[in-house]
Amino acid sequence: QRFFQAVLTDGQPIVAAVKLSQQGQFNLNEMEDKWNKFTATQLVTTQRLGFDWDARIQMTPGLNAFVHDTYLLGEGSLHASLLGLFTVAKLQGAPENNQGELLRFLAEATWYPTALLPSQGVHWEAIDDTCARATLTDGATTVSLIFQCNAEGAIATCRAEARYRDKVAAMPWCGRVWEYSVRNGMLIPLEGEVGWEY
């Protein structure tokens, strides 16, 4: 309740679609900090849950990896290629992939916070004064995240007990957002980071 009062205005229209531009750094290496610059555009729909993320990750000067990550009609899909020609990863439709992509949608909903309203299918369960568990079901997939709010009532962190990195191992996954600013009448974070806990 406190979160919605902090980030939404009275009468805030429900966000139906969003287009985002992103830039940042991406670490593809599990063993060491090896950060690569990326740029991306992302389209999100909230009435039929989904997103389409198109990213370009600079591996070395002149060598880019292209990553297309989607959640559409209840199915997660990831395709990564070098130079847009050579496929290096392809995942589609496995329950583990669907779970991971729906978790991503739920975590990123801080950018389109009306999607977190109970009227939009999110079930909230208070844990304490600053934390609550949000659960979202889409078709056969159900996911939960624990969100923690800052002193102002806006979301500061989220955490999933288990998100699949691949079809074998699920590990704790967490995110942090900050630098809140008003956009289209909503208070949303402009910066964030996510990753698996080792």
Question: Model regions: which residues?
Answer:
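N-terminal mature ectodomain segment of secretory-pathway/periplasmic proteins
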Residues: 5-86
